Swiss-Prot record:
Disulfide bonds join 112-148, 126-135. The gene is Alkal2. Belongs to the ALKAL family. This is ALK and LTK ligand 2. It comes from Mus musculus. Its main location: secreted. Coiled coil: none annotated.
Amino acid sequence: MRVSGRPMLLALLLLLSTVGDRGRAQSRGPADRQTLLRLLVELVQELKKFHIGDSKRLQLLGESDFALGRREATDYGADQEEQRVEIVPRDLRMKDKFLKHLTGPLYFSPKCSKHFHRLYHNTRDCTIPAYYKRCARLLTRLAVSPMCMER
């Protein structure tokens, strides 16, 4: 938890001024005032050093960690083929089981097999596991379409 130095400094000054002369019968001399002043100045300097240290720590974690270096900046976006994400097909039996679980048994007539294969093997919805629910919906719509209902 971070506490600002000013309220703490004001609290110390208030505390020192209220204690005052209770413990002493005689008034303070100039030497006591100088030591009190020196103590307060040292306290303020320590607080400043503490805050400067905090700001340096925050600065170290700041922009310099996330900035691209000269070499990284030139490599970024250099070759489009290297940045292309290659989707590795998962186990095709698992894909088939999952889609059968979502759709139930589907029948496609021979007239519709070309459309089925295009949809099943070439669309994003049926090749990326995150979109299998969309694929199941598309396959059921294809299966009940008038073109595919004929046997």
